Amino acid sequence: MFDFEELRELARYRDERNLVCSCYYPLEKGEPAGEGALIRLKNLINGALADREDWTGSQYKSVSEDLARIEILVAEELVLSSGGLAVFAASTAGLWKVFHLPVKCGPMLVVDRTTRIRPMIEFLDRYRRYCTVLVGKGKARIFLLDPGGVEE
């Protein structure tokens, strides 16, 4: 999961020289790659690369490398994880953040000078963390619940 401080840090990210890739992708544990999931991702990547307007050569190279890295990550996570994946990448600026979300999100891929965090904000608004206390004779238990699970 992630916390509000990480979200604030991503929200403040802005770089006039480098482009950042914001990718949200739904995962289904054990989904075979041949089922079209990777084809959908490849179509998103091709669309993002085709939409370049004022990118420099170095920006294009950086974005291409970041998108290739995201593609490899998604291919691995499709087999291992379920829920959703949020990735923020700008390798020339040293940004590589991966968040595993307990619910599906996306698919969405945006290349811009800022991060696209609206889906994560909506996720936090929809699935808030809450606390439950069980009190018994001489004993109490505190549980923190969020979409990622229960913590005692």
Predicted regions and their residues:
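Non-catalytic, solvent-exposed interaction/assembly segments
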Residues: 1-123
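Gly/Thr-rich phosphate-binding beta-strand-loop-beta motif of the actin/hexokinase/Hsp70
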Residues: 126-151
